């Protein structure tokens, strides 16, 4: 069966692993976009580390969990968000202004919403984590 939304599958794998208290999990297939989302989550401290494993079938990521993920998810459809609209989407998906992070695909790469606001760019919403 074909996977329709690999980002949603990856986020649900991370959430399930965090909810069950696992130390690590396997996210597959290993795409570039999922790798960028994992990089952002690692920089923010939501995961400890991740490594790419080539298995000849699309690859996979081995993710070491830090136990800090309360909820994460994919935002579908991928709404376009301008700099002025960022606060609306924060209120919609995050529990508080200082807790959590929206992940946005911008013209300068994939980044968290705090970095996007600092750089003065908008983009498409990919997911959230807190």
From Swiss-Prot:
Source domain of life: Archaea
- GO CC aspect terms: ribonucleoprotein complex; ribosome
Is RNA-binding one of the keywords UniProt gives this record?
A: yes
The UniProt GO MF terms for this protein read: rRNA binding; structural constituent of ribosome
Residues passing through the membrane, by range: none
The UniProt keyword set, sorted, is: Ribonucleoprotein, Ribosomal protein, RNA-binding, rRNA-binding
Record function comment: One of the primary rRNA binding proteins, it binds directly to 16S rRNA central domain where it helps coordinate assembly of the platform of the 30S subunit.
Full protein name: Small ribosomal subunit protein uS8
Q: Which gene encodes it?
A: rps8
């Amino acid at each position: 069966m074909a996977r329709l939304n690999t980002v949603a599958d990856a986020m649900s794998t991370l959430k399930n692993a965090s909810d069950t208290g696992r130390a690590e999990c396997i996210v597959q297939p290993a795409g570039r976009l999922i790798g960028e989302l994992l990089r952002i989550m690692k920089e923010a401290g939501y995961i400890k580390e991740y490594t790419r494993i080539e298995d000849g079938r699309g690859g996979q990521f081995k993710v070491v969990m830090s136990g800090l993920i309360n909820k994460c998810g994919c935002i579908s459809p991928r709404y376009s968000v301008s700099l002025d609209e960022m606060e609306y989407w924060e209120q919609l998906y995050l529990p508080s202004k200082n807790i959590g992070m929206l992940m946005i695909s911008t013209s300068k790469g994939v980044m968290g919403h705090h970095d996007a606001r600092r750089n003065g760019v908008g983009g498409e919403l990919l997911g959230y984590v807190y």
